[in-house]
């Protein structure tokens, strides 16, 4: 959504994202490719965490571990992606498995267990980057968790309604000045901001904004935000600097949807689960 305040922003361009398309070293191994931890997937929403985790794996993380927000994980493994390692969130947080970046909040729910999971993560994550999405943002807005997350990079990924909750504004006010809302969030939380929507805004912690021009209405379906959060966490886990990883993830997510539509998959009926394979193809292209 372009407004007078966003139409003049510089656009995110593929040629400005060399780290996304660099060749992988011949001596790479799963440890050198980064480990992503995903915290989410409360009752009835396990799919959200799995969408994020699958996307993280398919855009290049060496390992992806999932901590479900449940006392007992409802699944022993992901039958569609058995490479993912599933456990309950406490088991993951206490395992000390050398997580390089975290994606948290996808489908975690709004109950006390979810708030405890995120609070424990904020305390234990050390120097690992953090992507906070979905219910994680709603818990933050409600005061159920506190923004005590240290100096390592943090990325918040609100849609306009979530941004409004975080700022105490209406969705309409956020949409009327999307760059202003993104800058206000960056200043309030000392974080990178991805304000999602048509023409997503990426804002760094200092308030510099860019607009994304990739993507299409096929993304207007459940789970696409979880996929974006997984891509973001994965690129950060691969030790790509936030200056490349954050705009790069947003560009890649939209470009993956565009590539699917070009091949007749959508926009009507495009599903979130189809994005990760498309994003993988793009990362491996050199065009």
Swiss-Prot record:
Cleaved signal peptide residues: none
E.C. numbers: 4.2.1.136
Record-linked InterPro entries: Carbohydrate_kinase_pred_CS, CARKD, Ribokinase-like
Any Gene Ontology biological process: nicotinamide nucleotide metabolic process
Enzyme class: lyase
Entries under PROSITE patterns matching the protein: YJEF_C_2, YJEF_C_3
Domain of life: Bacteria
Domain YjeF C-terminal: 13-286
Pfam families hit by this protein: Carb_kinase
Catalysed conversion reaction: (6S)-NADHX + ADP = AMP + phosphate + NADH + H(+); (6S)-NADPHX + ADP = AMP + phosphate + NADPH + H(+)
Cofactors (names): Mg(2+)
Gene Ontology molecular-function annotations: ADP-dependent NAD(P)H-hydrate dehydratase activity; ATP binding; NAD(P)HX epimerase activity
Keywords assigned by UniProt, alphabetized: ATP-binding, Lyase, NAD, NADP, Nucleotide-binding
Chain sites annotated for binding AMP: 196-200, 225
Keyword Lyase attributed: yes
Record: residues binding (6S)-NADPHX: 48, 109, 159, 226
Function: Catalyzes the dehydration of the S-form of NAD(P)HX at the expense of ADP, which is converted to AMP. Together with NAD(P)HX epimerase, which catalyzes the epimerization of the S- and R-forms, the enzyme allows the repair of both epimers of NAD(P)HX, a damaged form of NAD(P)H that is a result of enzymatic or heat-dependent hydration.
Subunit text: Homotetramer.
PANTHER family: ATP-DEPENDENT (S)-NAD(P)H-HYDRATE DEHYDRATASE, ATP-DEPENDENT (S)-NAD(P)H-HYDRATE DEHYDRATASE FAMILY MEMBER
Similarity section: Belongs to the NnrD/CARKD family.
Cross-referenced HAMAP family: NADHX_dehydratase
Cross-referenced NCBIfam families: yjeF_cterm (TIGR00196)
Protein name as annotated: ADP-dependent (S)-NAD(P)H-hydrate dehydratase
Natural source organism: Bordetella pertussis (strain Tohama I / ATCC BAA-589 / NCTC 13251)
Lineage, opening ranks: Bacteria, Pseudomonadati, Pseudomonadota, Betaproteobacteria, Burkholderiales
């Amino acid at each position: 959504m372009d407004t007078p305040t966003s139409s003049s922003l510089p656009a995110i361009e593929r040629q400005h994202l060399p780290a996304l398309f660099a060749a992988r070293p011949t001596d790479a191994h799963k440890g050198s490719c980064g480990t992503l931890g995903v915290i989410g997937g409360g009752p009835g929403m396990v799919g959200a965490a799995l969408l994020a985790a699958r996307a993280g794996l398919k855009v290049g993380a060496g390992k992806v571990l999932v901590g479900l927000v449940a006392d007992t994980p409802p699944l022993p493994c992901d039958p569609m992606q058995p490479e993912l390692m599933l456990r309950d969130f406490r088991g993951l947080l206490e395992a000390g498995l050398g997580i390089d970046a975290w994606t948290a909040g996808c489908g975690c729910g709004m109950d006390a267990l979810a708030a405890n999971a995120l609070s424990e993560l904020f305390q234990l994550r050390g120097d690992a980057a953090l992507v906070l999405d979905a219910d994680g943002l709603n818990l933050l807005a409600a005061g159920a968790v506190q923004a005590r997350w240290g100096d390592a990079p943090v990325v918040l990924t609100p849609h306009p309604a979530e941004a409004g909750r975080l700022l105490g504004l209406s969705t309409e006010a956020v949409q009327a000045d999307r760059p202003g809302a993104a800058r206000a969030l960056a200043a309030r939380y000392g974080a990178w901001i991805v304000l999602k929507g048509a023409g997503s805004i990426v804002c760094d912690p200092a308030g510099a904004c860019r607009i994304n021009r990739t993507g299409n209405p096929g993304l207007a379906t459940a789970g696409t935000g979880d996929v974006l959060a997984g891509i973001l966490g994965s690129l950060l886990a691969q030790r790509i600097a936030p200056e490349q990883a954050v705009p790069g993830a947003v560009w890649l997510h939209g470009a993956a949807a565009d590539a699917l539509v070009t091949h007749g998959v959508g926009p009507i009926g495009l599903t979130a689960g189809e994005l990760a394979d498309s994003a993988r193809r793009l990362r491996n292209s050199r065009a």
